Regions:
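Long, low-hydrophobicity, acidic/polar, solvent-exposed interaction domains
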Residues: 5-178
């Protein structure tokens, strides 16, 4: 799925076959573009239209690795939180393409706190080649999840949607990127 903005930049959005949130009103778009320079992968952030009192929708290229995406999200979350004009009711959302229903869909993450590095407590680690929903136990008080920093954003978002669709109340609001 291609998504473009005014400067003819292209974003390949992640795909899923379900919609978590169908519509978001009063929002500012934030774009994280996939760029290459030689053999290096780079992220280019366009937040020119970000208004702190609105909901923010993050349109992130699915090819970008988490190690590049998460530091930018952390910076933007801090900027929004530190704004004198922020709204207590505004949310942050990741956008993706619902391929089954053929619409743009969203998953909220405003309450989520990203932590970099391996946790010092027991955690469900999700690596680039290993994801098993059955390992998410419903009997744990809290399940903290860690994602491999080399996962593509597209794969990460597919996992997030799958976990969301389990409707577990025990998932921590902290995620580790290791």
């Amino acid at each position: 799925v291609l998504f473009s903005c005014g400067e003819k930049e292209t974003i390949l959005l992640p795909k899923s076959d379900s919609t978590v949130v169908k519509e978001v009103r009063d929002y500012s778009p934030i774009y994280l573009f996939f760029k290459t320079k030689g053999k290096d992968t780079l992220v280019e952030v366009n937040r020119k239209n970000a208004i702190s009192s609105t909901n923010w929708i993050f349109h992130i290229d699915k090819r970008l690795p988490l190690r590049l995406v998460v530091p930018e999200i952390i910076k933007l979350q801090a900027k929004k939180e530190g704004s004198a004009h922020k709204s207590e009711t505004s949310e942050n959302y990741f956008s993706y393409s619902d391929s089954l229903h053929k619409n743009l869909a969203f998953i909220p993450f405003a309450k989520l706190k990203f932590l970099q590095g391996k946790p010092h407590k027991e955690v469900m680690l999700i690596s680039k080649n290993d994801f098993q929903l059955t390992r998410l136990k419903k009997d744990l008080a809290t399940t903290t999840i860690g994602f491999d920093q080399n996962l593509s954003f597209g794969t990460y978002l597919q996992y997030k949607i799958a976990i969301h669709n389990l409707h577990l109340s025990t998932i921590s609001k902290e995620e580790f990127i290791y």
